[in-house]
């Protein structure tokens, strides 16, 4: 974090403190006062003309941060020279403005105003580089650990977790006012004196904000008189300062550190223990610590300062802050990677469990299939045994049947000759039946032809009937018109009457033709019945001839057809059957004639047809 970013963080608090309505805008008069004070503390020459020119406007309304930032960057921050001003004065100016509005400790305040200011500076130093400024819980824990180390006490993690578990902290992090409220509550410093807390805050403030790597008393050997004098040393990244006492009022000198400097441990001599020396290009400084631990800490701190100079870094804690941020990012990446890996492992575990379940199902199905196969195999064996037993029984029966068949074969041979003779007789009979069937087919074809002619005549009769109905409707219309135009339509009525008579005459002719066709159909049906009677007669004879002759039957010597008797006309059964068929024909003819009479009866005396 560079100097401009540090200054902007402090100035941001001052700007937001002037924003009374929290609208993001500040009045121009207040911005002028703020700018004038910044000129003073930053040791920048005042440019009243530029200030008035930038804020010159007919409108006296407020100015937003976007409107103030160009002026702040161009006329103030761009002219800042590091080392020409005391940054603590800038922080005090901004703290004074923001504390008046926002810092109101409730009840008995534990922190003095100076400690609250130092905590505010520490918060700005360790806050994230985004606005509004917040400090993440990890940095808060790091800062509290530094305080506890300075006070040589253990951090109260229970109280810290209570503060961190708050919803606002979990979502957004610690604001500076939440942080100061936590420190003012006294829960983290319970049982510790206020003076001890203040000293710890000052020590941590000087270490982090003031870039003090190490402070303490050391014995220093003089360059001229070579005597040993106890001095208060303050180590910064580029300088080792020493004073008469720890109040740092009497500055006795400083040692510039660069890449050519080095520190070495010296053996004890001249009655001094824990000695070490700091070598520069021009001088060698011999120093003595109080104990070995202090010597180790000082040598390590000086080597760290030299390393920072070589690496071009001006602050140890800025470097540590960046490293912690990188570590957090790495931890976050590792956590995300671990979560992804866990998700992948869970997916693989679920897939494995699913496959195991499928495998179990397959095994269960395989076991069931194996059981079914065993059952099928057992059933097949039983069926095979039953089939084998049945085949043995059938084989025995076949042997017995073959023996009986061989005995019967001789009889069958004799019977076969008789059957062949009988077959020849049946073939002759079949030929006669086929002739009779052909006659029946011809009679049916004639009947179909007569029926077709009858249907055609019926269609013509229906068409003429429709025409007659149409003429009748026209006649009725003409009769109605005759009431209005009797003289004009009389001739037309006569012509229509003649046409009607002609249609009636044609209808009578059609009926006569239909009657003749009906007579032909009746004759054809009579022939068909006669042919059917002949076919039935020959079928009876053929069925009698198809009756097989048993092995034990005796035949008379009267010839092959001695058992076959042709029915005569005097047979009572045959006469009864013919009589019933003739009665059926007469009843059908009576029904047809009755239908014709009913049709004739429907015609009126004037030639019109009655509609049922």
Curated annotation (Swiss-Prot):
InterPro entries: EF-hand-dom_pair (IPR011992), PH-like_dom_sf (IPR011993), PH_domain (IPR001849). One of its GO terms (biological process) is convergent extension involved in gastrulation. It holds the Pfam family PH. SMART domains: PH (SM00233). Residues 211-307 form the PH domain. Residues 572-581, 588-603 have a biased composition (Basic and acidic residues). One of its GO terms (cellular component) is cytoplasm. CDD domains: PH_SWAP-70. Residues 546-612 are annotated as: Disordered. This is Differentially expressed in FDCP 6 homolog. The gene is def6.
